[in-house]
Every structure is written in C-alpha cells, then in structure tokens.
C-alpha cells in the first residue's frame, strides 16, 4: 500500500521520488540542476512534506532528519500547506517522525499554531499520536513565544458519557475520579461536612450532599476533625442542609459550591428565628423608634440668630419709627396730599402686597390711605413724564413697613438677582441722584432685585457674597437727598436735617443704572417740568 501511495504522491516528479527514497546525492544533483525545491504534486505535498512522511529504508537511504535538514538548508518553506491544510510539521507529528525532525522544523520557522481544514494543529496531532517527545518540543516552542498551551480532548468513558482529560506535560489519568488532585492542606471552607448514618434519617440519600474532596479526607488534621461522627454541630447543619434542595450541586460543577460558613449562618438564623411568627416580626418593626428630624432652618435667615445678641431689623425699625418726631409725621401727611396716583406696575398681586405689609408701627401709618400710598411708592418703579416718586420725607417716615416689606421679599433677590444687578456704577448726573432713592426696587427682565441696604449693612449680620463687605452704615433717622423735583419743592413744609456731602457721594456711587428708555420729547418735557418746579 505504501508503494501505491508513493507512486501517486510522486506523480512523476523526480525530486519527490528522490526524497521519498532517501537519496541525498540525487536530491542534491536535482537541486543544483535547477529543480524547484517547493514544487508539489497534485495533493499539494512538497519535498519537505514527503521527507517527513516517508518510511522507506534501504542501504543507500539516509536518515529522515538528515534529509529534512538538507532541504531546510536549501530554503524549503516549512509553513506551506497542502490541499487538506496540513503542513510539514503536522505530517511529522502524524507519522511520528520523532523529536529531532520536529525540533529542526521549529528552529527553521515552522508555526505550531497553523491548523488544517478540520481545525486541528500540530499539537493536537502530536497528542493523538501519543508522541511525547514531539509534544515536548512543541510546548517549549510555544512557551518561548510567550504562549501558555492547554490542550483538552474529549473521550468517552465506559458509561458513554464524555470525560475531560488534560494533557500538559503529564500523562493522562486513566479514571475520571483521579482528575482532581488533593491539595496539600484543606481549609475549613474547602471541606463539606458529611454525617454518619445515625445523624440523618433513613429517608435521606447519600447523593443529597456534595463532597468537595472525595477520597481525600486525610489532607490535614482539620478535615479529620470535621469528619468525625457524633458532633452535634454537624448533625444540625446536615439536617438543615437536607431541607434546602436548591443547594444541591453536581460533581461536575465545582464552581457552584457555597462556602459552609454561609450555610452555618443560615442555620443559626433558622434556629434563632424559627419560632418567630409574622406578628412578632410586625411587633419588632413597630417597636423600632426612629429619631425625629428637626425642622429645617434657613442658614441665610436672620431669624435663626439669637435675638438677644443680634436684634433684628424689624425691631430696630419699630424702635426708630416709634421715636419719629411729630414734625416729620405732620410733614408726611401734608406731603402725601398733593401727590397724584401714579400708574401701578408692581410684580405682585394686591392681596400679596397687603399681606406682606406689617401693621405694627406708628398710629399715623395705620391710616388706609397712607398704606395705599406707601404701596404705590414701593412698587411704582418706572418714572412717568408727569410725575416722580414721592419725596424722601414720606419714604423716611414710612421706613418701618418698607423695611419689613424688604425682609419679606428678600428671597426674591436671592433667586432672581444676578451679579450684574449688584455691580456698582458711579452716577455723575445730579438728576439721577435726585430721581432714584437708594432703597427702591429695580425692575429687571429676569425678576425683582431688592437692594436692601439697611439689612445688609447692620452690624452683627453676615453680608451677602456679592455685596461690598465694608459699606458705610447709613443713619436711619437721617433723611436722604430728595428723590424727585417734587420733593425739592416741599422743603419749606418740614425741617430736613442737612445731608453730609460725603454720604451723598457714597450713595450716588452705589446707585444702579435705571434701564428706562425715554423719547426726546419726554426728556424735554421732564426738563421743563424740573425748571418750573425749581
């Protein structure tokens, strides 16, 4: 049969014939005469493959290893594959060419990871051929390239089930039970308890438990002690585990193991809480008391401060307004009469404004008409061509409700005020100084900004982050500069304390620019009106 295969393999190729016969001189003459060393037959087999396959031996033939070495020295390619995908290395492993031939092929660049059409490499064929010498050379070559090789083949046991055998420089185990080698010393977490027949009921079967180290109970003293019969702990744990069928594991699934410490914890919980009923559980839950959370307090609120140490602005305003001279009150009543009702352009409804005003104060401020005028003075922000906001005297005498109104709406400035709204813009025009009191609201597109000078500059309170940390403390009892030309015309009606020029300059620097566009005709009318009033 070998002769028939040889005739078919050589296919009239003299080089393949010479190699198969092992004629080294003839092979050298053919190669020196111009024969192609990698020429193949109809199966795709080259001269190097034929040298690995042939078993012809006679008096004139040379050894297989010498022929392979000569072909490799003459630049024969060891990684050429035939039509079935096999290389010269695979053929050498299949035909058991020996470790020397395999070593020569590997040294000259043969790739042990190349696979044929069936997906098997030279490693698989070496294992199937039981060629340990060739397998050793293959493993050494793979480790030299930084590859760890683990080859697993499947065989069938006597019962017909597939068993797994691992070949890694060690002979395969004859039995399935010998696959697991015992460790040097087992730990308590690696040992599964198994009780004697006295501790378990007769109805229980031995397959209810999974023994991790079968046949290796003499690994160390710990496993011996835990496997002694008669221990009450083992009896209880075995009974509890018998009630848990979901903890059964197959012998072929060691990754499904559960540590005995987990089972012991479950056993202790069952012993402790086995007699408790649902009512007891509900009672225990009801008996648990949770600490009550105190009411949330605003860190920015001045009401959270100690009133004995830091009096609030409301109390200070009440004291000042209660001690207001009678001449100021009379001037306020006289000054409110000639003022026309200005257009209402507030941002809050009327009900909220009324609720925001605090009634305590001087008896003069309890008049409904004066409250109405104060509300209009506070929320009428845009200057009309025919009138201006009331004079500083009326605003000064009504500081109590105004400051309380500022405190009630101070949160609006926290949410809607931007850093741009608190920028200090110096005002050089005297009309802007007279037109705008320092404590009025300013209308912005995003909301209402409250410039609360008194609340932010009183000693004992933390100033806001975006306000000057060292502003001058204004005197509440001192009147500011008149806010409008109408107020300048009423100077003769009531005595007004003279203002300090320094204070006027400081307040004028703190003014915010009014975002109000006026036509040229309105500006002319306003200038004419100021000249008439002057």
Curated annotation (Swiss-Prot):
Annotated family: Belongs to the ANKRD34 family.
Alphabetical list of Pfam families matching this protein: Ank_2 (PF12796)
PANTHER family found in the cross-reference section: ANK_REP_REGION DOMAIN-CONTAINING PROTEIN, ANKYRIN REPEAT DOMAIN 34C
Annotated ANK repeat ranges: 10-39, 43-80, 84-114, 118-147
Domain of life: Eukaryota
PROSITE patterns: ANK_REP_REGION (PS50297), ANK_REPEAT (PS50088)
UniProt name for this protein: Ankyrin repeat domain-containing protein 34C
Start and end residues of each stretch annotated as Disordered: 159-205, 332-368, 384-403, 480-503
Post-translational modification Phosphoserine, affected residues: 301, 446
UniProt keyword annotation of Repeat present: yes
InterPro entries listed in its UniProt record: AN34A/B/C, Ankyrin_rpt, Ankyrin_rpt-contain_sf
Protein keywords: ANK repeat, Phosphoprotein, Repeat
Keyword Phosphoprotein: yes
């Amino acid at each position: 049969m070998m002769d028939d295969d040889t005739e078919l393999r050589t296919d009239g190729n003299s080089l393949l014939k010479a190699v198969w016969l092992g004629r080294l001189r003839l092979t050298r003459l053919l190669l020196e005469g111009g024969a192609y060393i990698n020429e193949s037959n109809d199966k795709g087999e080259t001269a190097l493959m034929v040298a690995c396959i042939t078993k012809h031996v006679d008096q004139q033939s040379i050894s297989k290893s010498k022929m392979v070495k000569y072909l490799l020295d003459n630049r024969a390619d060891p990684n050429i594959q035939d039509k079935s995908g096999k290389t010269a290395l695979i053929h050498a492993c299949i035909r058991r060419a020996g470790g020397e031939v395999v070593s020569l092929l590997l040294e000259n660049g043969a790739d042990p990871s190349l696979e044929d059409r069936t997906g098997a490499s030279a490693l698989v064929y070496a294992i199937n051929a039981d060629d340990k010498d060739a397998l050793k050379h293959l493993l050494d070559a793979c480790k030299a390239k930084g590859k760890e090789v683990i080859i697993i083949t499947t065989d069938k046991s006597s019962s017909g089930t597939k068993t797994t055998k691992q070949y890694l420089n060690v002979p395969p185990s004859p039995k399935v039970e010998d696959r697991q080698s015992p460790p040097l010393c087992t730990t308590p977490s690696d040992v599964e308890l198994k009780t004697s027949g006295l501790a378990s009921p007769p109805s229980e079967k031995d397959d209810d438990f999974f023994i991790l180290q079968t046949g290796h109970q003499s690994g160390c003293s710990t496993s011996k002690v835990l496997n002694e019969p008669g221990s009450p702990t083992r009896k209880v744990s075995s009974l509890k585990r018998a009630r848990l069928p979901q903890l059964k594991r197959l012998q072929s699934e060691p990754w499904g193991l559960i540590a005995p410490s987990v089972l012991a914890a479950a056993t202790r919980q069952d012993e402790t809480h086995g007699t408790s009923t649902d009512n007891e559980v509900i009672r225990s839950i009801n008996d648990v008391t949770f600490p009550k959370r105190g009411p949330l307090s605003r860190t920015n609120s001045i009401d959270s401060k100690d009133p004995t140490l830091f009096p609030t602005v409301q109390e200070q305003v009440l004291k000042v307004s209660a001690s207001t001279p009678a001449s100021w009150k009379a001037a306020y009543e006289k000054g409110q009469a000639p003022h026309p009702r200005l257009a209402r352009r507030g941002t809050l409804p009327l009900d909220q404004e009324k609720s925001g005003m605090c009634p305590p104060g001087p008896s003069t401020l309890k008049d409904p008409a004066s409250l109405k005028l104060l509300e209009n003075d506070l929320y009428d922000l845009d200057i009309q061509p025919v009138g201006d906001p009331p004079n500083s005297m009326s605003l000064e005498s009504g500081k109590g409700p105004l400051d309380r109104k500022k405190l009630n709406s101070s949160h609006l400035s926290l949410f809607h005020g931007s850093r741009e709204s608190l920028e200090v813009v110096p005002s050089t025009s005297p009309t802007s100084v007279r037109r705008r009191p320092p404590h009025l609201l300013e209308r912005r597109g995003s909301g209402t900004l409250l410039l609360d000078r008194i609340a932010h500059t009183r000693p004992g309170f933390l100033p806001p982050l975006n306000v000057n940390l060292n502003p001058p403390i204004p005197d509440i009892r001192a009147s500011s500069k008149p806010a409008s030309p109408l107020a300048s015309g009423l100077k003769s009606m009531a005595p007004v304390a003279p203002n300090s020029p320094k204070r006027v300059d400081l307040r004028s620097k703190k003014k915010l620019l009014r975002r109000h566009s006026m036509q040229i005709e309105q500006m002319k009318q306003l200038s004419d009106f100021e000249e008439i009033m002057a």
